[in-house]
Amino acid sequence: MLVIPAIDILDGKCVRLTKGNFDSKEVYYDNPADMAKMWQECGAKRIHVVDLDGARQGHLVNRKVIEKIVNSCSVDIEVGGGIRNKEALDYLFSIGVSYIILGSAAIYDKDLLLYSVSHYGEKTIVGIDSKKREVAVSGWLERTKIKDTELAEKIKEIGIKTIIFTDISKDGTLHGPNFEALKDMLKVGVEIIASGGISSIEDLKRLKDMGVTGAIIGKALYTGMIDLKAALLELEREGI
């Protein structure tokens, strides 16, 4: 199972939010590229990057910051937030991003989703952000009436192989992920990367036992609740 450190970018800095609330931001690092290098040195094989400004404004904002992250690391970089057109999508792959994450576009722009799948295949990931089992979009500021599993079934038919599932009510709380919702998502039959609330190695072990492909960790790393290097070593010893 992949353990994926998260870097959320707001105003060019590495921040964490709680439950997607922009007013709750905590700045952890001024230079996200240095943060990415540190996670790579700790043993991360992939890094999760979100342009929070982009998610809120509807277009990529932190392009230069993302470029610096990609140029600073040799591991896979996945990027989401504000990818709403072909130009942004093509640009990210052109600078060396390994995977892109479509969120709002998966609901509102089927053509873009189809374009990404046809041109980039399994490098296209869909992020499903759920609040009370309904999908939220636009940087979590807008809640739809679409059920999370319903969207998962639809995008599976289009050819999406991997979904990042985030329970917004858990994100940044350090209270553990929504295991019940993740069980339902796994029934769809695509690879699931869990995000939101992961706060311990025990959480990671349970996710692996469930069959989750990866786990994105944010606040637990930045607050020191999980030591990435130590966690990766322990999981490796246990064959996870």
Curated annotation (Swiss-Prot):
Protein's UniProt keywords contain NAD: no
Protein name per Swiss-Prot or TrEMBL: 1-(5-phosphoribosyl)-5-[(5-phosphoribosylamino)methylideneamino] imidazole-4-carboxamide isomerase
Cited NCBIfam families: 1-(5-phosphoribosyl)-5-[(5-phosphoribosylamino)methylideneamino]imidazole-4-carboxamide isomerase
Origin species: Caldanaerobacter subterraneus subsp. tengcongensis (strain DSM 15242 / JCM 11007 / NBRC 100824 / MB4)
Subcellular location: Cytoplasm
Enzyme Commission number(s) of this protein: 5.3.1.16
One Pfam entry name: His_biosynth
InterPro entries: Aldolase_TIM, His_biosynth, HisA_bact_arch, Isoase_HisA-like, Isoase_HisA-like_bact, RibuloseP-bd_barrel
GO CC, any one term: cytoplasm
Catalytic residues identified in the record: 8, 129
Family: Belongs to the HisA/HisF family.
Catalytic function, reaction form: 1-(5-phospho-beta-D-ribosyl)-5-[(5-phospho-beta-D-ribosylamino)methylideneamino]imidazole-4-carboxamide = 5-[(5-phospho-1-deoxy-D-ribulos-1-ylimino)methylamino]-1-(5-phospho-beta-D-ribosyl)imidazole-4-carboxamide
Pathway entry: Amino-acid biosynthesis; L-histidine biosynthesis; L-histidine from 5-phospho-alpha-D-ribose 1-diphosphate: step 4/9
